[in-house]
Amino acid sequence: MSGQYIPYHLRHNKSIDREIFLEGLNLLSKRLNIQEYTYIGFGGPMLEDFRIMHNRVALSDMISLEEQESTHIRQKYNLPYNCIDCKLISAHDFILDYSFSKPSITWLDYASPKKIQTDLDDIQLLSTKVSSFDILKVTFPINPSSYYQRRVGESLDDFKEAFIQSLKSLLGKKYLDFNLQILNTDLSDRKIKSLLIRIITNAFKSAIERGLSGRKDKILYYPLSLNQYNDGSHTMLTISGFFASEPEYMELSEACDFSNWQFFSTSWEDVQEIAIPTLTIKEKINLDSKLPDQEAYQAAAEEFSLNANERDNYFKYYRLYPNFQRIMV
């Protein structure tokens, strides 16, 4: 359901994003009984997220949503634990029918923008049904070519017009400000991703606000972490947070000390980039032997020419750096 499945061992940055989500759940568990939550997500054929959620968070009530029958058959064959209910159902139909009467952790991992307006409608629908302290994580593609592929030789003005029309077609007036002003400079390779992050974040906020607007309990959605990362052809934006009233949020924020969490996003604009370098075992061992001493680490990193962004990113995320080994089974 989440698109073409690519294993985590080929997507180091996505693996780190997942580790940040797990840390966030651990942070919330200081006041919330996370183990009693129902986990809802897109398992894929290997159900790797579900295996991790059970092993690391001790969740024992989990629901996997899948539309493709062939993948659903593989899920049932690869089922790691019998506490996972693999359903052959679309996310829309599930959200429509499910009561959300029990505390929930929902991860909607979207890999394609082709149905993004429908996906946002599902988020709006979900927001009408959740309760305080329910947790929602969403992943959106932000690879510009996924929204419009610039043609060879296409002028910048023509590209801008076609790109804007594609955004209007995909998001519609419901989720896109049709008066949005886009400059030619916004379409440079360096800036266009930031533009898309802003557009998709605003669309997500709009879906949430529409869903919550008619409620009597006046809960809001509070982001904990916003991340962007690239793994090969995939450029993704992830938003993780929870629903609560303002007093509930303030109490939980103080109890869990959000502001001192290394990966806490202080605002909707605080999108943190995960871009770890690919290291040899020798390089990693050498760097790790100097950590967490930043001065010694910087000197070691300069020995094999890591650029400043790579050095800073590894220093920030080294605890979460995945370590994959080949084994004989």
Give the ranges of each region predicted by the language model.
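N-terminal start-of-chain detector that recognizes signal peptides
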Residues: 34-36, 109, 211-214
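Beta-hairpin (beta-strand-turn-beta-strand) motif
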Residues: 89-92, 109-111, 141
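A structural signal for short, well-ordered beta-strand segments and their strand-loop junctions
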Residues: 41, 64, 107, 135-140
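Class I S-adenosyl-L-methionine
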Residues: 2-8, 96, 100-103, 113-329
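A generic, well-ordered mixed alpha/beta core segment in the N-terminal half of proteins
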Residues: 83-86, 104, 111
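Structural motif
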Residues: 38, 104-105
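SAM cofactor-binding core of SAM-dependent methyltransferases
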Residues: 2-99, 255-257, 271-284, 288-293, ...
